[in-house]
């Protein structure tokens, strides 16, 4: 189980990313449209003004049961060991255990 402070920090990052998403997107579009280097530099400086934690690259996918940041399966939103336990308990419809 992840510490609650880490989960709250991740939620805060998600809110910041949603807040500054449009600013980042518009700045990146402006950079591609402008041809002069000086104007690109000004837009680049403007792009650096939002907080660091508002960048989408700083977000992690977390298991929604345990909060674990690693070994997540996108289809289920679960970490690997929780997914395995749920499949063994037949709690995930359509998921089968492999055997050979």
From Swiss-Prot:
One of its GO terms (biological process) is translation. Signal peptide: none annotated. The keyword Transport does not apply. Keywords: Chloroplast, Plastid, Ribonucleoprotein, Ribosomal protein, RNA-binding, rRNA-binding. The keyword Cytoplasm does not apply. It is found in: Plastid, Chloroplast. Gene3D superfamilies: 1.10.287.1480. InterPro entries: Ribosomal_uS14, Ribosomal_uS14_bac/plastid, Ribosomal_uS14_CS. Part of the 30S ribosomal subunit. Binds 16S rRNA, required for the assembly of 30S particles. This is Small ribosomal subunit protein uS14c.
């Amino acid at each position: 189980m992840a510490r609650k402070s880490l989960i709250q920090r991740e939620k805060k990052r998600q809110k910041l990313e949603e807040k500054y998403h449009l600013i980042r997107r518009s700045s990146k579009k402006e950079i591609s449209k402008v041809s002069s280097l000086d104007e690109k530099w000004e837009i680049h400086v403007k792009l650096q003004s939002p907080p660091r934690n508002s960048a989408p690259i700083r977000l992690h996918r977390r298991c929604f049961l345990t909060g674990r940041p690693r070994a997540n399966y996108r289809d289920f939103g679960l970490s690997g060991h929780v997914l395995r336990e749920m499949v063994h308990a037949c709690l995930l419809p359509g998921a089968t255990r492999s055997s050979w």
